[in-house]
């Protein structure tokens, strides 16, 4: 399996597939926000940013998948998936174990040099409540789905990373 993942990581199609999954998830988020009229909370917006990080990793991998440039994309992928997983876990905990004393941030906080909520407010501005149940699909809430999605992204990224290490060992033994 690791050999298969190593071979896939050297093809442009697999990196485009990674970007495609991110685009689909972002489009679903925008559909839920603008068509179904579910207001995103701060944690939702931060999870969108984590998805964008995975998309950027896919873009870097797509540029030159057969060169060592892909080694730069894998840590970005792992970091973004990990941060997304932590955010989704926090969001799920808020919804499964509500506290009357908890209140999520009212505004997203981006660095002053990257004010995404000002550049693209329809995507990165939050005005929803984290503790509010918003939407169910197959008996799971959005936060629970995102927990599953980010866990899968992280597992695949770690396996792809391991496949690169194994490939390097084969290269050094020749």
Curated annotation (Swiss-Prot):
Location(s), subcellular: Cell inner membrane
Topological region Periplasmic: 32-49, 90-144
SUPFAM superfamilies the UniProt entry points to: DsbB-like
Entry keywords, A to Z: Cell inner membrane, Cell membrane, Chaperone, Disulfide bond, Electron transport, Membrane, Oxidoreductase, Redox-active center, Transmembrane, Transmembrane helix, Transport
Gene3D superfamilies, alphabetized: DsbB-like
Membrane topology: Multi-pass membrane protein
Gene Ontology biological process terms from the UniProt entry: protein folding
Single GO molecular function: electron transfer activity
A Pfam family the protein falls into: DsbB
Disulfide bridges in this chain: 41-44, 104-130
GO cellular component: plasma membrane
Top-level taxon of origin: Bacteria
Predominant location category: membrane
TM regions (residue ranges): 15-31, 50-65, 72-89, 145-163
InterPro entries: DiS_bond_form_DsbB/BdbC, Disulphide_bond_form_DsbB, DsbB, DsbB-like_sf
HAMAP family: DsbB
Protein role: Required for disulfide bond formation in some periplasmic proteins. Acts by oxidizing the DsbA protein.
Protein name from the UniProt record: Disulfide bond formation protein B
Lineage: Bacteria, Pseudomonadati, Pseudomonadota, Gammaproteobacteria, Enterobacterales
């Amino acid at each position: 399996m690791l050999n298969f993942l190593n071979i896939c990581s050297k093809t442009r199609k697999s990196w485009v597939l990674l970007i495609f999954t991110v685009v689909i998830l972002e489009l679903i988020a925008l559909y839920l926000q603008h068509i179904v009229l579910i207001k995103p909370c701060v944690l939702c917006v931060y999870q969108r940013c984590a998805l964008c990080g995975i998309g950027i990793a896919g873009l870097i991998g797509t540029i030159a998948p057969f060169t060592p440039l892909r080694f730069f994309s894998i840590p970005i992928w792992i970091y973004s998936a990990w941060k997304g997983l932590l955010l989704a876990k926090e969001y799920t905990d808020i919804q499964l174990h509500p506290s009357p004393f908890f209140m999520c941030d009212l505004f997203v906080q981006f660095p002053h040099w990257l004010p995404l909520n000002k550049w693209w407010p329809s995507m990165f501005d939050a005005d929803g409540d984290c503790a509010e149940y918003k939407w169910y699909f197959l008996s799971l809430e959005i936060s629970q789905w995102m927990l599953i999605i980010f866990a899968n992204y992280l597992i695949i990224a770690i396996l792809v990373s391991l496949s690169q290490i194994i490939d390097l060992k084969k290269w050094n033994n020749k």
